[in-house]
Amino acid sequence: TYAGTVFRRQDDEESRPNEYTQVGYEMFDRAEPISADAEVFALITQALGAAPVKAATGDIGILVAAVSALETSEARKGALLRHIWRPQKFRALLEQFSTPSVARDVLGLDNPFENAGPEIGLRRTSDVKDRLDELRADAQITPISKTVVDLLDALLNIRAMLPLAVAQLWDLAVEMPAIGPAVERLGARMIALKTRGVDIEKIEFATSYGRSLMEYYDGFVFGFYAETRTDLPPIATGGRYDALTKQLGQGAEIPAVGGVIRPDLLLDLEGAA
């Protein structure tokens, strides 16, 4: 556990403070990550007490599993995976990769550098040649089928209370078997939450939830929002960030999950109640 001052740049909403107090709880557990997810969520729920908030959850791992199993090039899958946390860019790439490529004139030239001027900037002729080779290879790739795009859309559009969402995901897993293990983990997490006294019927789940939050969340993700103050940012947030520990540890990783509460926002809610 920890408590301290957080400094955060606000690019889009200048009215939000750049500095505020945050209280957090983190767990590092190799043995039972699902249990750790449930424990962190349950403790945050308990700490919020009777505050008028509603819970929203997601699981980035489900979409990661779906994208990783696409029958397309590794380069295209890599691009989609990098932009999971940028929904608009992800959508643009998905549309691009599901449309037959239009060969650019320059790709068909025997010598695209004929009559070229002097090299300017950091990119050398060899870099441009490599990029042209990549574009030629990409132009030969079979587009992602409309059926697969429709399945991804159906996956991203799932939004319901947790038990119903799990059922809907299992139905979709019939056509998308690659998401099965991730959905199984979600179901196990739901049971673990219920075991800890959390009312799972009041937890909303959306496959897309968390894609515009912190990019380092790569699995379970959650947030608590004021029911009557839609102008406020999340009162509490959290999630799993296994990949971040691997990045920071330079290959030495440990499964990690945590959550934070904004005491100032919680006091605002209690004062308004």
What are these regions (language model features)?
Residues 2-53, 105-273:
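Positively charged, Gly/Ser-enriched RNA/tRNA-binding surfaces
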Residues 55-59, 83, 207:
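A generic structural motif
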Residues 19-24, 57-66:
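Short, conserved phosphate-binding/catalytic loop or strand-edge motifs used
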